[in-house]
UniProtKB/Swiss-Prot annotation:
<comment type="similarity">
    <text>Belongs to the plant tobamovirus multiplication TOM1 protein family.</text>
</comment>
<feature type="topological domain" description="Cytoplasmic">
    <location>
        <begin position="272"/>
        <end position="288"/>
    </location>
</feature>
<feature type="transmembrane region" description="Helical">
    <location>
        <begin position="102"/>
        <end position="122"/>
    </location>
</feature>
<feature type="topological domain" description="Extracellular">
    <location>
        <begin position="97"/>
        <end position="101"/>
    </location>
</feature>
<feature type="glycosylation site" description="N-linked (GlcNAc...) asparagine">
    <location>
        <position position="165"/>
    </location>
</feature>
<feature type="transmembrane region" description="Helical">
    <location>
        <begin position="76"/>
        <end position="96"/>
    </location>
</feature>
<feature type="topological domain" description="Cytoplasmic">
    <location>
        <begin position="191"/>
        <end position="217"/>
    </location>
</feature>
<keyword id="KW-0472">Membrane</keyword>
<protein>
    <recommendedName>
        <fullName>Tobamovirus multiplication protein 1</fullName>
    </recommendedName>
</protein>
<dbReference type="GO" id="GO:0046786">
    <property type="term" value="P:viral replication complex formation and maintenance"/>
</dbReference>
<keyword id="KW-0945">Host-virus interaction</keyword>
<keyword id="KW-0926">Vacuole</keyword>
<feature type="transmembrane region" description="Helical">
    <location>
        <begin position="251"/>
        <end position="271"/>
    </location>
</feature>
<feature type="topological domain" description="Cytoplasmic">
    <location>
        <begin position="55"/>
        <end position="75"/>
    </location>
</feature>
<feature type="transmembrane region" description="Helical">
    <location>
        <begin position="218"/>
        <end position="238"/>
    </location>
</feature>
<keyword id="KW-1133">Transmembrane helix</keyword>
<dbReference type="GO" id="GO:0009705">
    <property type="term" value="C:plant-type vacuole membrane"/>
</dbReference>
Amino acid sequence: MTRLPLGSSSIDIAGPTTNWWDQINESVQWQDGIFYSLCASYALVSAVALIQLIRIELRVPEYGWTTQKVFHLMNFVVNGVRAIVFGFHKQVFLFHPKVLSLAILDLPGLLFFSTFTLLVLFWAEIYHQARSLPTDKLRISYISINGAIYFIQACIWVYLWSNDNSTVEFIGKIFIAVVSFIAALGFLLYGGRLFLMLRRFPIESKGRRKKLHEVGSVTAICFTCFLISCFVVVLSAFDPDASLDVLDHPVLNLIYYLLVEILPSALVLYILRKLPPKRVSAQYHPIS
């Protein structure tokens, strides 16, 4: 009785399905197409943030640099830098020493952290004011935490510049993951608190419902994106096949940056698109 070569047929079937990922990753055309698409996406989000900043400034120029204006300015900068990085991806991923490539890829991520934790600071101030709690130390805490993060990361880069050590590079990735986890906790803590406080507010109004939707949506989006970032960075620290710092992982880069930065930025900018009300002149008195 003749035996059928089941092993070879299963390999023939599995081969095309397992190789398409490698074929895309190793294709220069696919690499260029994906990274230039990321460049265009970041440039679009950056332009939207700049347009919104200009609209706010034209609407209320007398308010100075409010949290809302700073948030949109930082969004413009972060997404603009990412667009430039991916526009010159061939040079960025192949920099020598390697620490230059790591720094250029990681710095926008730290700026993204600073940009979105600005919302956490804003919500914390609102929550503390509503609870009659002191707010004077909140901004100091925000600046101190960000300053400490940039200082530690700079020390890691300087060490890698002088001594390209795989252990220190591993520590650097874990540090970035911890930073993302801190941001996720910040949104869960203060976004969640503010959301629950608004839900318990006794007076029902259209403004309350809008603010409830705004806080809930932004909290869910930002908590999710920072948690995904934490998970992927930890995974890449232990598994080289999940690394984001190489040219031949374009599909992984596309999925990661879409989920972690581009879509969250676009959605939050859309949710926070409402312009602040114009200041009523002191000389104007409405007809009663």
